[in-house]
């Protein structure tokens, strides 16, 4: 109601956003003629002038109109592409730290150059984030001529790069890379033992391409650096064998909405009988409950060719949003091992977390964050609440001509597929290309078999054939082409009507500087083929004429195909099922009708589809039965469309709640991570950490006095225990209660005496060993102990989170309990850390003749990178005594401290 009133008074949000953007665009346009009049040298020197103005205190906002006008002119001169006004709007929105929603084919990559260039002038580095290595490299190379002309350096991060290559890439003004690489490099930077080993600079400004995919679809995916665990894998095989013996409905119940499986009372008894145990929920069987639960999910919730595929003896997760395989990614909490046992492949050992972060918390570290996508408006609430990002919808340069037809709904999946087959045959007969969207490999293969049986030639794009992705997408716009794509596989590559424009690659690789060749290339790009043909005749060699002839021939073939597809109605999108998120459906539709091209779309649904079956309304099914509809008859009505929209909104709301809830849990770890990494960086950045150690000594002394000598009555003190502690540090402390009885504040006097004695001992030790050796030694001791304690704490927190759900049975809030217990555990871990560092510092011994060990400067990589499976809650718990007393093998800090640490441990 309030929104409607505001809309009447102030206009819609879209209108309000445009009112803010249009005056700035006019200001940019007013500068176009003066910028156009500059020669190349003057134009390229603009960067230097802008930087000087920033140094003098001018803001980026005030430089924006000139900077954007400069980029527009440079783009035209170097690449032949001039930014449209709507792209200027997109660039302004990005610079403001917003999400620019721009439809497919509107030129998001070119739009980003505006905000990227402007923010690079600040000198703090700009990160451009893409969904895969290919797009990072493609976009960086594609836009590089603009940046090169302006004297702005560009770096690209690729998965297979070594440490030194990464340092060079991050040192550039602009760095392109994937969300995974940026996140993992951040974690690794917080595991190094020397500040020069860090690769990233600051987190100043990031533009995230396909922002909905990264910040929403992958929000529940933690990045994890792990080390090996000693846990055996035979338990997974043992538990896997009992699942086929359990009956659904009697022993367990499947909750498809929550994607969960719950044991019944009868099921618990049955499991106890099969495993020959008395009580499944006895403390010693906590892990067993967890593994039974995960095995049930592996068998009853997770399906092969839908959630994962088995390739070369390995279980590979399928991205539910793109249909792509996610190599190297594993489900967490033993679920992946349970699926491996189910599929009878080699079971990998569970790993132990050394460092982790979610994309939600990584990207919230940036001073300014922005994003681009074709579909963000439906998730505007989540972007605002989680990331404080506004979605600004940018109007298309040319209005969309695509015709979106109403959904057709059938009673059964069989009827639906028959109708789809009929429609595809009809479309292909008139040479209209069709992109068929499915939500799983399983469904795409069912449809593929039906098409093959009907003699319809087609291509399939899913996780099993993703290597051919670029080629299949490039040809999806050919006359009569039928392409089956799982979800949004191929996103990031435009489907061009008429098929791949191969001649463009030929033009780009033809580097001849001859003036006639240049004119020929320009006329081809403008589709002026008659003039191009006359230029070909004037070329001075047979070799040039032959190449020009090949290009002309290729253009003519494409143009003929292009016109044929236009006449047939453009690309038709045929959705075989509605996705849980409207945004994914909109992405599929958005593949058609780019830049004013004609196109059409329609979704075919059945009451047996997952969305309709699990979340849909029973009224639709009842209506179809009541109407006594014959087999094969479809229904098109507003009521059905509204019911589907409501179902999708319910699922979107449910998924948002899950992501928000998980973030509240992850925020607990994030606050702790910030404290640890800040402490670590303080050690790395300072050669002399004696002030930090002195503070630890004071805290340790204070804790010992509070523990053993409470209050101001010396007669009640346990001086013997205090003396025992001080002897362990070799303090040679002489104390007698008599000397403190006359003091006005006996406890304070005791603290001052013990503290000053400890500090004198600390200083004399540094003098004896040699200050240079001592500085290096205590920094290495600090980092080794910090990394070890942090790893142990992560292990304990993982198990706390895994079992915290059980407090719900006693009517306590699991999140509140997790925060309370997590805080207590962290407080204890920090106290133990300080005590251990002080104890180690006082006990370490180095012979008098020791020389300063040469500090190792080479970088050493530690741990395995895992993009974890979706975070989720599971059964099973670990009691506090087990988690706090865990024995974890110490691993070296990255950076090469192994030899030094070994020698210190021996001396200790």
Swiss-Prot record:
Q: Which GO terms describe its cellular component?
A: cell envelope Sec protein transport complex; cytoplasm; plasma membrane
What processes does the entry annotate via GO biological process terms?
A: intracellular protein transmembrane transport; protein import; protein targeting; protein transport by the Sec complex
- Subcellular localization, as worded in the UniProt entry: Cell inner membrane; Cytoplasm
Give the bilayer topology. Peripheral membrane protein
Enzyme Commission code(s) on record: 7.4.2.8
GO molecular function: any one?
ATP binding
Q: Where is the composition biased (Polar residues)?
A: 874-884
Enumerate the Pfam families for this protein.
P-loop_SecA, SecA_DEAD, SecA_PP_bind, SecA_SW
| Residues that coordinate or bind ATP | 87, 105-109, 494
**SS bond partners:** none
Is Cytoplasm tagged as a keyword?
Answer: yes
Matching CDD domains, A to Z?
Answer: DEXDc_SecA, SF2_C_secA
Its catalytic activity? ATP + H2O + cellular proteinSide 1 = ADP + phosphate + cellular proteinSide 2
Chain residue ranges for the region called Disordered: 871-908
Q: Which UniProt keywords apply?
A: ATP-binding, Cell inner membrane, Cell membrane, Cytoplasm, Membrane, Nucleotide-binding, Protein transport, Translocase, Translocation, Transport
SUPFAM superfamilies xref list? Helical scaffold and wing domains of SecA, P-loop containing nucleoside triphosphate hydrolases, Pre-protein crosslinking domain of SecA
State the protein's purpose. Answer: Part of the Sec protein translocase complex. Interacts with the SecYEG preprotein conducting channel. Has a central role in coupling the hydrolysis of ATP to the transfer of proteins into and across the cell membrane, serving as an ATP-driven molecular motor driving the stepwise translocation of polypeptide chains across the membrane.
| PANTHER family xref list | CHLOROPLAST PROTEIN-TRANSPORTING ATPASE, SECA INNER MEMBRANE COMPONENT OF SEC PROTEIN SECRETION SYSTEM
Would you identify the family this protein belongs to, as annotated?
Belongs to the SecA family.
Q: Which HAMAP family match?
A: SecA
- State the name under which the record lists this protein: Protein translocase subunit SecA
């Amino acid at each position: 109601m309030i929104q409607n009133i505001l809309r009447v008074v102030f206009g819609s949000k879209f209108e309000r956003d445009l009112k803010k953007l249009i005056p700035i665009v006019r200001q940019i346009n007013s500068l176009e003629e003066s910028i156009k009049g500059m020669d190349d040298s003057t134009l390229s020197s603009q960067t230097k002038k802008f930087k000087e103005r920033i140094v003098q205190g001018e803001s980026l906002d005030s430089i924006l109109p000139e900077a954007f006008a400069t980029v527009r002119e440079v783009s035209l001169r170097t690449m032949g592409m001039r930014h449209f006004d709507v792209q200027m709007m997109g660039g302004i929105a990005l610079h403001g730290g917003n999400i620019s929603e721009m439809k497919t084919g509107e030129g998001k990559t070119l739009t980003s150059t505006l905000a990227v260039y402007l923010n690079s002038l600040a000198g703090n580095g700009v990160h451009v984030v893409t969904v895969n290595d290919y797009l990072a490299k493609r976009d960086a190379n594609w836009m590089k001529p603009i940046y090169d002309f302006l004297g702005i350096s560009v770096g690209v991060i690729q998965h297979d790069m070594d440490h030194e290559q990464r340092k060079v890439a991050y040192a550039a003004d602009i760095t392109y890379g994937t969300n995974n690489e940026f996140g993992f490099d951040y974690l690794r930077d917080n595991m190094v033992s020397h500040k020069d080993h860090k690769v990233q600079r600051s987190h100043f400004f990031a533009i995230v391409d396909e922002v909905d995919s990264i910040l929403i679809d992958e929000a529940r995916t933690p990045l994890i650096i792990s080390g090996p665990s000693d846990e055996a894998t035979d338990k997974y095989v043992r538990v896997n064998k009992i699942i086929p013996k359990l009956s659904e409905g009697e022993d367990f119940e499947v909750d498809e909405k929550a994607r969960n499986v719950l044991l019944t009372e009868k099921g618990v008894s049955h499991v106890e009988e099969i495993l020959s145990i008395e009580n499944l929920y006895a403390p010693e069987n906590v892990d067993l409950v967890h593994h039974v639960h995960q095995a049930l999910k592996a068998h009853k919730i997770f399906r092969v060719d839908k959630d994962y595929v088995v390739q070369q003896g390995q279980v590979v997760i399928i991205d539910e949003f793109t249909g792509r395989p996610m190599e190297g990614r594993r489900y967490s909490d033993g679920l992946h091992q349970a699926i491996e046992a189910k599929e009878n492949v080699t079971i990998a050992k569970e790993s132990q977390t050394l460092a982790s972060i979610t994309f939600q918390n990584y990207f919230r570290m940036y001073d300014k964050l922005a994003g681009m996508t074709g579909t963000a408006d439906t998730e505007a609430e989540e972007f605002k609440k989680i990331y404080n990002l506004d979605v600004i919808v940018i109007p298309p340069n040319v209005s969309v001509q695509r015709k979106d037809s109403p959904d057709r709904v059938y009673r059964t999946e069989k009827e639906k597929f028959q109708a789809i087959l009929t429609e595809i045959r009809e479309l292909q007969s008139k040479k209209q290309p069709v992109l068929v969207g499915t939500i799983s490999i399983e469904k795409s293969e069912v449809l593929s078999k039906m098409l093959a049986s009907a003699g319809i030639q087609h291509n399939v794009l899913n996780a099993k054939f993703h290597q051919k992705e670029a080629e299949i997408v490039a040809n999806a716009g050919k006359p009569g082409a039928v392409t089956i794509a799982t979800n949004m596989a191929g996103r990031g590559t435009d489907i061009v009507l008429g098929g791949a424009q191969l001649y463009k690659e030929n033009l780009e690789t033809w580097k001849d500087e001859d003036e006639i060749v240049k004119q020929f290339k320009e006329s081809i790009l403008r589709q002026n083929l008659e003039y191009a043909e006359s230029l070909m005749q004037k070329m001075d060699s047979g070799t040039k004429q032959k190449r020009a002839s090949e290009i002309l021939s290729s253009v003519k073939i494409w143009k003929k195909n292009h016109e044929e597809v236009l006449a047939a109605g453009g690309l038709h999108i045929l959705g075989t099922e509605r996705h849980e998120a409207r945004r994914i459906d909109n992405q599929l539709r958005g593949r058609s009708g780019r830049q004013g091209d004609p196109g059409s779309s329609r979704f075919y649904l059945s009451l047996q589809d997952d969305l309709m079956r699990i979340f849909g309304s029973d009224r639709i099914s009842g209506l179809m039965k009541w109407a006594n509809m014959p087999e094969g008859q479809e229904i098109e009505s507003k009521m059905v469309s509204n019911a589907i929209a409501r179902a999708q909104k319910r699922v979107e709301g449910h998924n948002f709640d899950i992501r928000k809830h998980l973030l509240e849990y992850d925020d607990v770890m994030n606050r702790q991570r910030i404290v640890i990494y800040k402490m670590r960086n303080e050690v790395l950045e300072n050669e002399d950490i004696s002030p930090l150690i002195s503070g630890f000594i004071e805290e340790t002394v204070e804790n010992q006095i509070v523990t053993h000598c409470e209050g101001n009555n010396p007669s009640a003190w346990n001086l013997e225990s205090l003396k025992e502690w001080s002897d362990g540090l070799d303090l040679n402390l002489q104390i007698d209660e008599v000397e403190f009885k006359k003091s006005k504040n006996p406890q304070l006097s005791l603290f001052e005496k013990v503290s000053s004695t400890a500090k004198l001992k600390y200083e004399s030790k540094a003098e004896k060993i040699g200050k240079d050796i001592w500085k290096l030694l205590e920094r290495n001791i600090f980092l080794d102990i910090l990394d070890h304690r942090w790893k142990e704490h992560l292990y304990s927190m993982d198990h706390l989170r895994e079992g915290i759900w059980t407090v719900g049975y006693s009517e306590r809030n699991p999140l509140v309990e997790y925060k309370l217990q997590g805080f207590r555990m962290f407080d204890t871990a920090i106290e133990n850390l300080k005590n251990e560092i002080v104890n180690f510092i006082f006990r370490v011994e180095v012979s008098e003749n020791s020389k300063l060990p040469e500090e190792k400067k080479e970088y050493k990589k530690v741990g395995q990178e895992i993009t974890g499976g979706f975070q989720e809650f599971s059964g099973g718990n670990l009691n506090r005594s087990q988690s706090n007393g865990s024995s974890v093998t110490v691993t070296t800090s990255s950076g090469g401290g192994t030899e030094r640490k070994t020698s210190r441990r021996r001396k200790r």
